[in-house]
Amino acid sequence: MSREQQLIDLLYKEVVPAEGCTEPVALAYCAAKTRDVLGHIPDRIDVFASGNMIKNVKSVTVPNSGGMIGIEASVAMGTIAGNAAKELMVISGVTKADLPKVQEYLQKDCIKVFNASKPIKLYIRIEAYYKQDKVIVEFKYTHTNITLIKKNDEIIYEVDDADNKSNLVDEIISKFSIKEIYKIASHLDTSKISDMLDKIVKDNSNISNEGLVHQYGIQTGRNIRSGIDNGFYGDDIRNRAAAAASAGSDARMGGSALPVMTAAGSGNIGLTLSLPLIEFAKSKGKSQEELYRALFFAIVSTVYIKSSIGRLSALCGPTCASAGIAGGLAMMLDLSEDKVEKSIINALAGIIGIMCDGANSSCSIKIANSVYAAFDAVNAAMLGNTVTPHDGIVGDDVEGTIKNIAILATGKGMNETDDAILGVMTGRLADICK
């Protein structure tokens, strides 16, 4: 298989539709799968989730739930009314008529949640019981990656951990570089990926418009648009792009049932990457081919950067997307390869370090800041200005910078930060910091 085809295949594996925040719907998917294997609505469910999963489910609204939040609500939605065949669209078919049954199940207090205390940042295990039967379904590493299905003493499905990791997107993309991804994107026949990119433009634009028209969360997108309208902000592409991206997150975190095309396992990253480039292309009269090359490069390069950090971490995911936006903008501006890389370096140097305090309404603020950082990074690179190597976390080049960020993100200090954030969010900071 050619290197180009590997990246095309990776794009189709990586960019998938999801309704709502990916962590709650992943739990709903796991719960629906568990119920299907059990063959009954469970009498009792024990949920074991990694700290990062708990962090990202605590504060967001579950789509189609009538405003419910939390792990128990996500699991109950999947158990009572989820369709496991739809994966991350598992609860897209839930109606108002289903909600009384979901509420009734929650009132039984039969769902218990435990911190799995695993080194794996993205981990879910659901153990469900019905009379004498017990089913275990386990997910690792990604939101749809089933690694174990067991009913009573029978292992129905199991994947060896080493073999499983070698087939994951993160392992595949790690064998590339920003330079190679750029070269492939520059010469790619975009007709090979147009169906996927058509869907990205359509779905992500739809939820952005939803967030601009209706009131969700802190309304960051609407706030920026209002600032443009009343003259507090300038009516320019930088502000319009920030409004578009953050509005999509407002709607998504606020429980909109509209689908989002994800990237790097995150709908917010998918929105952050795509909407500024769509707005820029529209504003500057760029061709569909120019936009699609930029989207391909932005998505794949962000997956590459995120692969060294992890799907879930103490670092805010959309800040990695800032680098992808910068690369995509630089490509649409037909800047040199050197300036494309310098745009990415500037973005990473300027925005990386924002912590992830779980999926919540403030994600849209972080997304707006990530978009602003991307535009500023490209402007600086166009003017010949780049953060000097070895200033802070910046390495000799773009690869060295990404490597340094990976060290920062995966080290002991950041793991302790993650624990402290979770402690603050769950009211257990004193216990965690002992």
Curated annotation (Swiss-Prot):
GO terms for biological process: L-cysteine catabolic process to pyruvate. InterPro entries: Ser_deHydtase-like_asu, UPF0597. GO terms for molecular function: L-cysteine desulfhydrase activity. Pfam families: SDH_alpha. HAMAP family: UPF0597 (MF_01845). Belongs to the UPF0597 family. This is UPF0597 protein Fphi_1065.
